Amino acid sequence: MARKKVQRKLDGWKSKEWYNIEAPAYLNRVIVGTTMAGDPSLLVGRNVETTVGELTNDMTKNNTKVILRVNNVVGDIATTDLMGHELTTDYVRSIVKRQTSRIDANVDVRTKDGFVIRVKPTCFTIKRARSSQMQAIREMMVDIVKKRASETDFETFMQEAILGRLSAAIYRQAKFIYPLRRVEIRKTQVEAMPAAAPAAPAAA
């Protein structure tokens, strides 16, 4: 009986194929991992986690997780959509200092091409700020993020959010309300895609 169970497991593995998981074209189609499946359609909808460090070959950026979702399988390539990013908990903790203020915001924005994204920017001040200053900075963060999303398409907005250009834009303006030590886009999450958004084609 035990031999039959082992044989069935071996036969199951033999019937499965390996698939490369590929990042979207605007993330340079980097292969972020491999997986096995007996039926490639079962891969569609599966979330895959990687890091900016792996996507850019810069290990100093491993504190930023990137979430991809398989949208199609062509041959042995599973293509993906970018679904968001998040800073690691350890990294965020390392930024927090005593006698300073942390200012969080949570805002849903719509890009020029119709993607709805939840964005969570965070400011860290040099010293402890007053509640009125914190509120003013929070409102400015929300305004900047909304405006930038409305001006750009999904790919541009997400690249700016993940690679630091959006946080730099917030820093440049909000520092005049109260001195800031750092600004981060702590998390993004795709809430809705436009109905006409096509699945990414596999690389030739």
Curated annotation (Swiss-Prot):
<keyword id="KW-0687">Ribonucleoprotein</keyword>
<dbReference type="InterPro" id="IPR018281">
    <property type="entry name" value="Ribosomal_eS1_CS"/>
</dbReference>
<dbReference type="Pfam" id="PF01015">
    <property type="entry name" value="Ribosomal_S3Ae"/>
</dbReference>
<keyword id="KW-0689">Ribosomal protein</keyword>
<dbReference type="InterPro" id="IPR001593">
    <property type="entry name" value="Ribosomal_eS1"/>
</dbReference>
<protein>
    <recommendedName>
        <fullName>Small ribosomal subunit protein eS1</fullName>
    </recommendedName>
</protein>
<dbReference type="GO" id="GO:1990904">
    <property type="term" value="C:ribonucleoprotein complex"/>
</dbReference>
<comment type="similarity">
    <text>Belongs to the eukaryotic ribosomal protein eS1 family.</text>
</comment>
<dbReference type="GO" id="GO:0003735">
    <property type="term" value="F:structural constituent of ribosome"/>
</dbReference>
<dbReference type="GO" id="GO:0005840">
    <property type="term" value="C:ribosome"/>
</dbReference>
<dbReference type="InterPro" id="IPR030838">
    <property type="entry name" value="Ribosomal_eS1_arc"/>
</dbReference>
<dbReference type="GO" id="GO:0006412">
    <property type="term" value="P:translation"/>
</dbReference>
